[in-house]
């Protein structure tokens, strides 16, 4: 009966709605049931309340024609467009920020090669416009406007419309041609010219009379002299001959001299070069849509504010930096310690050392209290704002560091320059590896600092409360203080807002701290009483059993015989 009575009292005390103990105030921080894992300098898996993904992995399945001007080469690459190949007439006068070359582009005229193809391609792409200026060239005693069956325009034999194929005259003459053009303008001129390589000696003399022919093009600072390479080659569009195209830039005040005795594919004018233009070229099969984006890749456009992307290493204009990582998360909240399902026996509240608080939704840091008036929770906005300001500043600085305009184009080399191509790819791979490592390190460093900052703000808040309460309360070691004086909700609020005056309550707190109180059912006393109750119950049970045996023996109901 005694043990049952004691257990009943314990249960009744635990289920009571009225709190009769000393007031308690606890400090805590926000928590969520499922946080986000981030990497720091010291740990690969740290759970935080919130984090921001820094790597963009989504792209649009199209190229955006705004705000950048895109020109679709369609079946023409940029060099064929500059030469004026049939099927490229839509590029006449075209202007672009990004010239889109298609993998399906084909040559549609006389078979040709460009010995320095990539340089010419780059010059044309960077220029951003096909601004062709026609000029008058006085060629003497030669036939002009040669045509070829390999170069059909509207099913009629034609030729590159920016070039003039010179052949011998009807009088079987091809005298020495020597022509000079002076650049009196204020811009650089790009001249594209060519040399025809016949397939046989007969073709050479039939076209130019002179065998061998020769073409020499000179400026004040350069000279290129080419002797035709006569010989049979594989047939392409019905032709075994070839044309080699060259290019010469003539600066303002310079001049260009054409000297030939045959085989010259002469220019009809020049392209105006714009040194201020920063256009480029992109080789991709992705269609042009109607979206808006400043970043283009060979896989589509990217629309994002994130500083990194792992979509493509080939990117144009205002693009995030390419990194190998699929994810880099920047902590934007504090360390997450999910709240336990139960907080000790009989609903005891706990502070930040044990866990976070999932109910603290209007701030990062806050208070919980328990007194005679009940329990309550309130956020501390000052410490919350201090942490947010520091984290926001870190986020802005990180984006500023990494959000430089990044432009990485695909570089190609002729097969003869294979070693250079391998070296270039090695350098690019090394740069990407280095930047990927730097990005990961930078994010880990910022995450470490973020967690340290938020932990520091929690400790600052705890120290502020401890200095206010001083000897009026006892630190319970779990982020809570037990207050040794009566503290109603107004008193609790003064602790929260920093206006608490410990001198007002000092005498009461000291008296209560040393006063001999009645038995207090703390966790330790409850255990002792339970053990005492259990022992007494066992003793009473044994005593009752012995008394029954003695009574039965006296009445003869039980006989006890002892044999020796």
UniProtKB/Swiss-Prot annotation:
GO terms for molecular function: host cell surface receptor binding. Its main location: virion. Gene3D superfamilies: 3.90.20.10, 3.90.209.20. GO terms for cellular component: host cell plasma membrane; membrane; viral envelope; virion membrane. The chain crosses the membrane at residues 528-548. It is found in: Virion membrane; Host apical cell membrane. Glycans are attached at residues 18, 34, 178, 310, 497. The record marks 343-344 as: Cleavage. It comes from the Viruses. Palmitoylated. One of its GO terms (biological process) is virion attachment to host cell. Residues 549-564 are cytoplasmic. Residues 1-16 form the signal peptide. Residues 17-527 are extracellular. The keyword Signal applies. It is a single-pass type I membrane protein. Binds to sialic acid-containing receptors on the cell surface, bringing about the attachment of the virus particle to the cell. This attachment induces virion internalization of about two third of the virus particles through clathrin-dependent endocytosis and about one third through a clathrin- and caveolin-independent pathway. Plays a major role in the determination of host range restriction and virulence. Class I viral fusion protein. Homotrimer of disulfide-linked HA1-HA2. This is Hemagglutinin. The lineage of its organism: Viruses, Riboviria, Orthornavirae, Negarnaviricota, Polyploviricotina. The gene is HA.
